[in-house]
Every structure is written in C-alpha cells, then in structure tokens.
Amino acid sequence: MSLDLSKKVVTVRPDQTIVTKQNLPYYLGISTKTAGTLGLSMNLVVIPPGASPKAHYHKDFETAIYLLKGRVETRFGENLKESVINEEGDFIFIPQGVPHKPVNLSDSESALAIISRNDPSEHENVVHYEP
C-alpha cells in the first residue's frame, strides 16, 4: 500500500438505528455507506432484556464481537445444539457460515456489543437459519 494524502479520517456518530434481518436494533457505525470502507464494518448492537434474535448465518464474512455489557448465550452449529456463554469484556469470533442465535440472559438489562465484520455491507449477506 502506498501513501495517500488525499484521503481523510472519518468520524461516524452512532445516532441512527436500523432493525436488522436478525430483528435487532443496530446503531450504525462504520460501513461503505457511512465511511466509504472497502472491506470492514463496525456497529453497536443492543440485545433487549430477555431477547433473542432470529437464528442466522453470515454467508461470506467473519464476525468479531466485543461484549461491552451483559451476559449472552450464543447457540450455534447444526440445529443450534452447541452453546457458549459470554460475559462483559469477552471477545467472540463467529466464522462465516456458522448458524448462530444470541440470547440475552438478563430479564432486566440490555446487552451491548461492538460488532466488526470483514464485509462493508454486511446486512445484505445475512441469511436466516431454520433449525
């Protein structure tokens, strides 16, 4: 990669939310649309108390998650038979093509996470999974 003095640093304030295919509220962060990225996205996701979004998998990208707040069980694999429980401060990696479904284990507090993916337009490459 060569030096490029024509590009600028971009700041994105996460003040716009969307509801994703997984039925979760996302605060839009870094993506092709917001920052002109070529191979990266990063958003803030909120899982409401007791909520569990639709099971899904990511067709062509990997996902890295940092759990800021809460306790979340992620069910994954064939028929979602496997699971892992993560707590505040954990990093989570989900390979492409792995079906999964997070569950907020709290009935009173939202779980918050930063989600980064190696796809700048990742919402278009999410596929629902029916176990």
Region roles according to the model:
Residues 1-39, 54, 128-131:
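A short, N-terminal "cap"/entry segment at the start of jelly-roll beta-barrel domains
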Residues 35-38, 47-51, 69-73, 119-122:
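Short, charged/polar surface micro-motifs in flexible loops or helix N-caps
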Residues 44, 57, 76-78, 104, ...:
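Residue-level recognition of conserved beta-strand positions in structured domain cores
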Residues 52, 61-88:
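A short beta-strand-loop-beta hairpin characteristic of the jelly-roll/cupin
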